[in-house]
Each structure stands twice: as structure tokens, then as C-alpha cells.
Amino acid sequence: MDKKWWKEAVVYQIYPRSFMDSNGDGIGDLNGITSRLDYLKDLGVDVIWLSPVYQSPNDDNGYDISDYRAIMQEFGTMEDFDRMLSEMHKRGIRLVMDLVVNHTSDEHKWFVESRKSKDNPYRDYYIWRDAKEGKEPNNWGSCFSGSPWKYDPQTEMYYLHLFSTKQPDLNWENPAVRKEVFDMMNWWCEKGIDGFRMDVISMISKPEGLPDGKIPEGGLYGDSGCVNGPHVHEYLQEMNREVLSKYDLMTVGECAGVTIEEAEKYASADGKELSMVFQFELVDLASGTYGKWTDKRVPLKDFKRVMTAWQTELEGKAWNSLFLGNHDQPRCLSRFGDDSPEYRVVSAKMLATCLHMMQGTPYVYQGDELGMKNVPFHDLSEFRDIESINAFHELTGAGKVAPDDMMRYLNLRGRDNARTPMQWDDTASAGFTTGTPWIKVGPDYETVNAKNEMADPDSVYNYYKKLIHLRKEKDIMVYGTYELLDPEDEALYVYTRTLGDQKLLVMCNFTKEEQEYTVPETFAGAEVLISNYPQDGAAAGVRKLRAYEAVVLETK
């Protein structure tokens, strides 16, 4: 059993724009985060993953970086950052920074130079191509709708941007680019940060020759083939040699489209690349003709199949990261649970139990520990997310989706659901700001807020606190092997964890109907470790699991 601090940690993701505003401008900031560190210490988390706070024109909420060694003015100064880091470390909390190096902002000095002329020293920092028969160099589609090629009249060539037009892709084939990135990473490590979460890192290596891609049925553009490109592992191993191996870091790669076999390469136990990856097979379930824009729910059998494959097939080979939501996903409670007032609390606790009892490093997205849910958006003007707004115009404009249907899809699946302000108390704007918040506040903030949750011993917050505390006490939660029971059951998710002669049985009812379950004989005499309902009576035999009930039994 190869023990590591990051395997035993619980990570809390902060989306800084929406966490806490200290100066009344309606935008969360670094001093706001510092002011709330005692809350996170009380919750018990070990690591904070901070979404980008670098200098940025903010075309894509900070994922378009114009200076990697400066802080976005809306968020504060480098002095504010240094103080925040110091205060985290005083409380025993580590900091993982978001690293965005597939692309920069078009306002980064490298790109400003690159576009000036074809012989500029920075020209090959980016990917430039001539037109093909008067059109884009190939048929690829951008991740944010439309073509990923933008014509630049200055040099009469196109540059590649897999995301927005203001996010030109870096040319990782150029050794000078890699050196710049590694130097910058070392600079942050010397400041004392504890790791990196690497944005779309599986896309940094482009296919040789940038050929046309296959157009999916009903689609408008070809697949770029940039996921898990030909040199991605080479580049990450070089990054590991030049930066990561010199420090005691936690590294996680955001790897959309990654298979279990690929994940083994990215996060192999031999430590040559990353600590772990984010896989999106679970959150990409129930996609439709237009990708995520659908109202389909994820069938529990599919949920179990995906979670189980990653649990069992990476066992002993690589490490899992466990998450049901983040800043790019709708609220996990609304997506996988039941956010109605009647079941909000029990189903939020059930989802947390199901996730935190698995093998891997759990991630808590800000507000999930309060049972925050999707927020109703009634008009396109209320959205702030470039992805949602672009998708609305593209799909309704092409006559593919009716506007009312598209609004429903945006409400169910849009990224702004996770980006509404953190609900601290029942005062105006949920205590997030004394000014006007940059995006609307959830309408339920008067009841669902941190102040209420902390005061109520039976709250979602205090349940998360228990789960996080248990992980520190119970090696079996971290290192035990996983086995799924009853894979075909469409209502219950039941699995075991085993470490030596210790065993846990995790039972989760994913429905609001009562479900019967026969507890295996091996758990006769077992005790309840944690549950989201009061428990009585014997552990073994037939149990009736109430609406969204979760029970964990432990053999001694």
C-alpha cells in the first residue's frame, strides 16, 4: 500500500469569483477567501483547489490568461495572494493552483508579438496556418461552438483556438514554449504552492498535420482529434522531470475523453507524470445529439457501471479523483439527486456518502456541502457563461433546437448553475457581497446558507464534516478495495470496501421510494458507521431503505 498525503486528502474547490467578496464590487476575491478560511478549517478539508486567479481579460472566467505571474485585478494583488497562502498553511491547508497552458489569452504578450509578423520570434509559440481554398485550414469544431480557426488580417493567416477566439492554442511542439511553461511553474512552486490542477491537459498535443476530422451524425464540424495526442505523455514526462519531481506536489490532469487505459499512463503509480486525472465519463453520461444539451437523466445502472469500472480497473495501477460536480457542471444535487424541498437534505447526504466511501481523492465543490442546487434562469440575459450563450445562438439559430427547449437544457446543464454566489447567510445577496453580485443569487439563500447549516447538527454541512473526519480515521475508506454488489439494481447502489479483515458495506437508495435490501451474512453483527437517517435494530437480514437513504455498515 503506497501511502501518499494526496490520497488521504479531501479537496475543496473554490471558484473565486463566486466565493466571497471583501470589497463590495460584487466579485469574489482573494481577501474574501482568506476571511473564510476558518469555515474551511472547521469543515475539515485538507486542500483547496483554486480556479484561476491570474491576470486575464476574463473572456472565459479567467481561463484566458494574459500574465501567468500576476493576479487578476478584480481578485486583488500578489500581496493578497501571498497572505492567503500563508494563512492557509497556518491552518494546515494546502493550495493547488489551476494551470491553464493549452492556450493563453490573445492579450498575452507572447500572442501580441506572435501576430505581428510571420518572422516574429514568438510566431511559433502558437499554431498558424494558411487558408485552404479560401476557407478555414480544416473542418474541426471548437469546444465553444463554431470553427476553431480565426483569420488574422495582419499576416493573412489563421490561428488555432480550440476554445474561444480569445484563447489561442500554444504550440507545444516548440521547445521554447515548453521551457516558458516549466519556468513559470517552477516560479509558483518556489512561492510554496502545493500542486496544480491542469486544465484540458490531454489536448496539448495536436495530431500530426492537423487533418480533417470525422463529422458525427447530425453534427456541424469534424472532431479535432486533439484529445490524447501523439506527444502528450512525452510532454508530461518532461514536465515531471523539469518541475514536478523537484517538489512534494499533488497534480491532477483534466482529461476529457480519457479512457481507463489512458488514465493509467497519465497517473501511473510509478509517478512519471501526474498524481491523478479527472475523467468525465460519468458527467458525460446521458449526452444527446447536441452533446450535453439535453434533459436526459443518468440511469443508475450506467452511473454504477462507470464508477465501478474506474474503481476496479485502476486498482493498484493509478489513483482516482472522485467528483460529481465542479465549476463546469450543473449542481450534483440537481443532476444526480433530488433538489425538491422534501428530499434536498437526505439526497445531498446520500450522494456525498456514495462518493466519499469510494477509493480515490474526493473533491467538494463550493456549496455542495450546503446542499446548494441549480438556480432557475428565466431569460438568456441572466446567463454569464460564454459556452451557454454561444450554444443557444448556434443551436437555435441553425433551427436544430427550439428556444424554449434550449432554455430548459441550459437550466439543467449550464455551467452558471455552479457559479451563482456562495450562500453564507440570510442577509441581502446571501452575505456574499455588500454590492450587486456579478451573477444572480439562488432564491433559496434565506434557508439554505452556511450560517443555518453550521448551527443545525443534522444539516448537510455537518454530515460532510463527519464524512471528512471519518476518512482521516479510517484507512479502509482511503485504501480499501472496492466491489460492486447487484449491478443490475436500478434503485440501489450497494458496494463493499475491504482492507485486510475489515469490511464496509455501503448502501445508497437513489430513489424516493422505499427499497428492500438483504444484507449479506458477512455483515451480521456489523455496526452502523454513518447514515443520513436515525438507525435502529440489527444490521443483517432484510433492510427497508427509506427515500434517498444511505447506510454504511462496518465489521469490527
What is each model feature region?
Residues 1-556:
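Active-site and adjacent substrate-binding regions of carbohydrate-active enzymes
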